[in-house]
Amino acid sequence: MPPKEESSKVTRRSTRSSASVTVENSEPIESHTPTIDDLTFGEESITIDAVLSNFPGRRSQIFDFIRLMGPLDCPTLPIMIYGGASTGKTSVVLQVLRHLNRPFVYSSCRTCYNPRILFESILNQSLLHRKCSLNGYSSAKRCDKPSDFVNLLREALSSVIKTLESTSETSRSDKPDEKPMGKMVYLILDNVDLIRDWDKGTIILQFLFSLYTVLKMPQLGIILISGLPPDVYYSNMGYTDPIPLYFPEYSEEDLRQIFLRNQPNRKLYSAFLDVVLKPFCRVTRRVEELSTTFSLLFRKFCEPLDDLGISPNEDMKRRLYSHLKPLIAHCLNEIFRVSSHPHDGETRGERRQKASYSSENREELEILDFHMSTSAKFLLLSAFLASRNPATLDASMFDSTGGMDNRKRKRKASEKSMEKKEIAEQEAVMKGPGSFPLERLLAIFQCIASVGDSSFGEEDEEEENTTGYDKENNNLMSDILLQVSSLCDANFLIKSGSCPLEGSIRYRSMVSEDLAQKVAKSLSFPLSKYLYRR
Amino acid sequence: MAPSGTVADPPQCSTTDSFNSSDTAENDIRPFFVLHKASSGNHNGKLTGIVKSKRRIESPSPKIAKRSEVESVEEEDGQFFSTLRFKVFETVWSKIEKTIEDVLRNSNSKVFSGIHDWIRESFESIISSGALKLSEAVRSYPVLTQASSKQLLTAMVLTRNLEMVDDLLTFEELELHLKSQGCHVAKLSSMDFSAKSGVGGCLRGLLRQFVMPTVDVADVTILASWYRENKNHENPVVIIVDDTERCCGPVLSDLILILSEWAIKVPIFLIMGVSTAHDAPRKILSVNALQRLCATRFTLSSPAERMDAVLKAVFLKPCSGFTVSHKVALFMRSYFLCQDGTLTSFVRTLKIACLQHFSLEPLSIMLEHFCHDGVNQLSGEGTELLTEATMKHAFDLPSVTRNKITRSTFEMLPHFLLDLQRMPNPWSIVVLCLYEAGKFDKLRLLDIFCEILDPEARYLKYFSPSEIVNSQSHNSGRNNVIRRVLRKLRDLSPSQLSSMLKSWENLTAEFTEINDKVIELHPFMRAVEAAGQRQGLPNSPKKHASRSNSKLEKELKAMTDKVATVIEFMLREYMKPVESVPFHEILCFKNVDKLQSALLGDPRGRIQLDLLESHDILHCVCCSQRGTTLLPSMHDTSILYKLAQEHADVINLHDWYQSFKTILIPRSSKAKQKSKSSSKSKKRKEICEEPEAPAEALIQARFCRAVMELQITGLIRMPSKRRPDFVQRVAFGS
């Protein structure tokens, strides 16, 4: 979410006011006792130019936000900052407050995932309380009702404001150089759009939006950060509308400026951005996503180079680009990447095998790479067929001899009926796999398992052991419902609603055709004979 | 499953006239010796037996006294061995079990070390990028640093098995391994990720394992605060989710999003167990959560690989001496491949086979000495257990009678047992050599093991010249293991042949006869390598670029023929199946039917047949008289199930009940008899025989109970809400 920027490590100066605060509990020296200074950002204040340089493309938003905050100790109306993900909303707010050196309380509705945790998080920060082993990791006050929260928050904020006033008077006379904190406290609520998914989220949202009106404390400023626009939160209740501040998506030039910051070799990275920025901006403009992908691609981009400090010329740029080009299309489409660790022994073995069996590369890709029992494989194929084939074709498809070869001939289709078939086929593809009852699955399983048993029977007959055939048949059928449960656990089968007529559970196969082909190949099962092609 | 307490007595020895007077005297002395031994075990009843037998000896009829002595000795042996056999079973099985556990632990240790190395490397890089101050670490707003990526370092552990049974133990051992290395480890299962408790449920599970068991509210800031206390921050935090695919996707996504927000302040490593493919989380997690994962793949050994390791440790290396026959091995392989494919079930099968072996075979007590590998003990202490009754039983074993070994050579029994004990050594070496050769074709040790146990040694026919010529055209040869090994030999490259011969040489180092044969192949191997170097393409012998290439082909073909000769030599000389050795019943379990009935039970169709043909099982008088007619004396469930056959898949409950009621009330039969206008004497007889008609309430109660039993059995399904009048018949597996 936040753009990249350096944070300078500065030892925080201890002020006289922190020493004057009485500590109720004596804690070990190592641990940290929250003080009034912890309500500010905690590091040295930065200039407005530093804030602007940290956030290219956000100049107007920063100035608007500072204007809405107003001068020191000036009451302000609630502010709602909204925009897409990874547009710098939270970072800008925090950096501006760092620049202004004003106390604030921050809570994210993702970490605080229910009302009680949210309320107690705000109260703990206001009361300068930290959960630790000494207090049994409990909150300062228990609070799970909005009405209790209003009263407790008013008390806590009144106490903080009194402390701020006394601190302000002291610091004026003793330290004229330090920037004053003022007497305003800002409440920052991040990710408020997540509240809508909570239990009774609508009530909580209305409460938070009316908090300014209910509290009636001019020393409190409320800042709401949301991923959704204010129109989503409209309701009939009367409350003060927060002032909206929109953070649009970054432009391509803004992204270039963002990624070029803090690069040791700007020319080399600029050449890299010339290659990758335009195609990736069409997919996403999230800095978070692009940053992860670009760091991976930049390492690949620099592989042919020995010295990372050089300025590339045109010929070198072309060479680096051709080296990188095969990866770009791949990374554009991929969301989830799994890298291999060098300690993974299996990967080494596989690589060695691939090197020695170059002709078998295709076979290895087609081999099923996890273990399933034979009955689970047949059951998976049964589910695949039950989802793909129409139910009316089961009788002709799964007769004793099996397969579509029994059809003597097909009628010649006219153009009209072929057109209808194509339309029906497209509709079926759009709908996805169909659902089927459990009885149909087990009936198909029984048919194709007997087909599979005949291949086992051939093996047994060759070994002159006819009793094995019967035992194999018994083996496949036992514990079949347990196999159904296993396929459901592995997400190969999902339960999809109930039949409106009989109320029984219907299943749906989530197996891709590639996986079904792999399973059928491992069983030597003629899947294409049983699969209906429109 | 409980073994029978009494063992069937071995057949009595009939006294023949061939015994001379001195032999008879010796035979009389031996029972006294055994009785004396038994009485030392504090058996009070035996003292009375001794006294009684003494009196009988003094009696005037000596033949009767001798028979009674023999019978008492036999009973005593049965009881004594029955107790001893279970002790030996516990000894043997505990050794097998420990061997299996060690093998399974070693098979995963490399992956576990890899995971730990990955965690430590990543943890060091996180720390080196900048340590946070205490106040920064516990604040609620995010840290704005250059490396403030919210990526969550994740290991995808690929279990490669659809079933989760084996992997539960694996992840428990992974947890112990990481904890022993100093990591803070918490393990969550799919039950923690339920949609009902939401993300709070799994957070509470985490905090209970890390912080304290009584956390009021599950809050991530508690974890951050705990991490900064008492030097907890010197070690990484690891969260293991062992069955990712079973978790509730939205809840897991929420947890990942929350943890990634705090990934800078608390270095969290996520380990997810995936069973099908390493990109399986793509189906479960949301796009936002997928973007937060910086995933690295680790692969566990597959069930087939672990099976091979277990087989090698239990049956091929000196472990316990216990082994199984060809049919039992085939059944166990089929059970592993066709049922659930878990090693847990295979070990359970092995334990049942071992237990049944000790409960059925009296001489299985000898396995204790095999277990300890004490040759001297076998010749000394072991023979004390060999009473005359057990000697009779030993020489009546099928393998002994087939080899025409008579009782006159019973002094040779220790010699036979010694050979039986030493036999597995060259046998296992040959099996391992075959396994090395079969690795190039990805053959599994389980398949090799099943084939070479064949007592008829059918695999030897593949070495005949006509078979070698015809092997190319046999399509069904794919399923044969030895044939596949021989065909694969022709496709090996010189480097592969060389590596195989080196491994063979290592395996046969302790066995001179085979090792000499392998060493003899070295000159031919060097000739092949020389030809390959001259060609300049050692790994591509199939090319026909020049005449020297054809020379390389000739050298290679000669080499493979000699290797096949060595394989044939090994198989013929040392691959004797255990079932062809005398006295092998002592340590080899052969009863495959008992094992199958213990494991599989009856198929579902058996239930239906039993209900339809109850007369064939009960053999009752009333049913045989009336043929297939339904009678009130039949069991209610059978009556109902037979009536259900008259209906289609959907059965109307009211009609079903009326038919059932008609069967039970004898008044209808009276009416039928009257309508047939039978004689008066028959009428009176039936009136006297028929019981009173049961009450309506009783008929309904019996009907409901029978329907419930059919439902429990799984043969019918109860009415649904929309059709309360009908039940549905579940018809499959018939």
From Swiss-Prot, chain A:
<keyword id="KW-0547">Nucleotide-binding</keyword>
<dbReference type="Pfam" id="PF14630">
    <property type="entry name" value="ORC5_C"/>
</dbReference>
<dbReference type="InterPro" id="IPR047088">
    <property type="entry name" value="ORC5_C"/>
</dbReference>
<keyword id="KW-0235">DNA replication</keyword>
<dbReference type="GO" id="GO:0005524">
    <property type="term" value="F:ATP binding"/>
</dbReference>
<dbReference type="GO" id="GO:0000808">
    <property type="term" value="C:origin recognition complex"/>
</dbReference>
<dbReference type="InterPro" id="IPR020796">
    <property type="entry name" value="ORC5"/>
</dbReference>
<dbReference type="GO" id="GO:0005634">
    <property type="term" value="C:nucleus"/>
</dbReference>
<feature type="binding site">
    <location>
        <begin position="83"/>
        <end position="90"/>
    </location>
    <ligand>
        <name>ATP</name>
    </ligand>
</feature>
<dbReference type="Pfam" id="PF21639">
    <property type="entry name" value="ORC5_lid"/>
</dbReference>
<feature type="compositionally biased region" description="Basic and acidic residues">
    <location>
        <begin position="414"/>
        <end position="424"/>
    </location>
</feature>
<feature type="short sequence motif" description="Nuclear localization signal">
    <location>
        <begin position="129"/>
        <end position="136"/>
    </location>
</feature>
<feature type="region of interest" description="Disordered">
    <location>
        <begin position="1"/>
        <end position="36"/>
    </location>
</feature>
<dbReference type="InterPro" id="IPR048866">
    <property type="entry name" value="ORC5_lid"/>
</dbReference>
<dbReference type="GO" id="GO:0006260">
    <property type="term" value="P:DNA replication"/>
</dbReference>
<protein>
    <recommendedName>
        <fullName>Origin of replication complex subunit 5</fullName>
    </recommendedName>
</protein>
<dbReference type="InterPro" id="IPR041664">
    <property type="entry name" value="AAA_16"/>
</dbReference>
<comment type="similarity">
    <text>Belongs to the ORC5 family.</text>
</comment>
<keyword id="KW-0067">ATP-binding</keyword>
<dbReference type="Pfam" id="PF13191">
    <property type="entry name" value="AAA_16"/>
</dbReference>
<feature type="region of interest" description="Disordered">
    <location>
        <begin position="397"/>
        <end position="428"/>
    </location>
</feature>
<comment type="function">
    <text>Component of the origin recognition complex (ORC) that binds origins of replication. DNA-binding is ATP-dependent. The specific DNA sequences that define origins of replication have not been identified yet. ORC is required to assemble the pre-replication complex necessary to initiate DNA replication.</text>
</comment>
Swiss-Prot record, chain B:
<dbReference type="GO" id="GO:0006260">
    <property type="term" value="P:DNA replication"/>
</dbReference>
<keyword id="KW-0539">Nucleus</keyword>
<dbReference type="InterPro" id="IPR020795">
    <property type="entry name" value="ORC3"/>
</dbReference>
<dbReference type="GO" id="GO:0048527">
    <property type="term" value="P:lateral root development"/>
</dbReference>
<protein>
    <recommendedName>
        <fullName>Origin of replication complex subunit 3</fullName>
    </recommendedName>
</protein>
<comment type="function">
    <text>Component of the origin recognition complex (ORC) that binds origins of replication. DNA-binding is ATP-dependent. The specific DNA sequences that define origins of replication have not been identified yet.</text>
</comment>
<feature type="compositionally biased region" description="Polar residues">
    <location>
        <begin position="12"/>
        <end position="24"/>
    </location>
</feature>
<dbReference type="GO" id="GO:0009744">
    <property type="term" value="P:response to sucrose"/>
</dbReference>
<dbReference type="GO" id="GO:0003677">
    <property type="term" value="F:DNA binding"/>
</dbReference>
<feature type="region of interest" description="Disordered">
    <location>
        <begin position="532"/>
        <end position="554"/>
    </location>
</feature>
<dbReference type="GO" id="GO:0005664">
    <property type="term" value="C:nuclear origin of replication recognition complex"/>
</dbReference>
<dbReference type="InterPro" id="IPR040855">
    <property type="entry name" value="ORC_WH_C"/>
</dbReference>
<comment type="similarity">
    <text>Belongs to the ORC3 family.</text>
</comment>
<dbReference type="InterPro" id="IPR045667">
    <property type="entry name" value="ORC3_N"/>
</dbReference>
<dbReference type="Pfam" id="PF07034">
    <property type="entry name" value="ORC3_N"/>
</dbReference>
<keyword id="KW-0238">DNA-binding</keyword>
<feature type="region of interest" description="Disordered">
    <location>
        <begin position="1"/>
        <end position="25"/>
    </location>
</feature>
<dbReference type="GO" id="GO:0000808">
    <property type="term" value="C:origin recognition complex"/>
</dbReference>
<keyword id="KW-0235">DNA replication</keyword>
<dbReference type="Pfam" id="PF18137">
    <property type="entry name" value="ORC_WH_C"/>
</dbReference>
<comment type="subunit">
    <text>Component of the origin recognition complex (ORC) composed of at least ORC1 (ORC1A or ORC1B), ORC2, ORC3, ORC4, ORC5 and ORC6. ORC is regulated in a cell-cycle and development dependent manner. It is sequentially assembled at the exit from anaphase of mitosis and disassembled as cells enter S phase. Interacts directly with ORC1A, ORC2, ORC4, ORC5 and ORC6.</text>
</comment>
